[in-house]
Amino acid sequence: MKDEEWDDVIATNLTGTFNLTKALIKNMIKNRYGRIINISSVSGLMGNPGQVNYSSAKAGLSGFTKSLAKEVGSRGITVNSVAPGFIETDMTAYLDDNAKAKLIEDIPLKRLGSVQDISDLVIFLSSEDASYITGQTISVDGGLFMY
């Protein structure tokens, strides 16, 4: 892997999250309320061959989420992370039928997820119903990675 490939992925997935959070957190602290929901990946939880940069960045988001949750929880702010598995998106559209079938073999629910599966969790974590959930990385992966 070239240094540039490493740097670009870390900058997008980890540094970008830091910069966005830094820009928004002061207002949340002032209002004593906020919901921060980071988008990670099961690759950050279980690793993925050929994606050491991506897996490292997404694993870093889990640490970021936990640490920030401890820092700002007393101010009414929850911080969580959603870790999608294999979801029907542009990232999986390139897979041929054989590759897709092989992936599905390893998923206990025997299907790829949908964007709706992810958005439903994000909406829940944004709501008052999730006011006692913080510092968590929640997988939406059909059971692919259980810990």
Placement of each model-derived feature along the sequence:
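C-terminal helical subdomain
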Residues: S81, I104-D129, I133, V140-G142
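Residue(s) in the substrate-gating loop at a strand-loop-helix junction
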Residues: S41
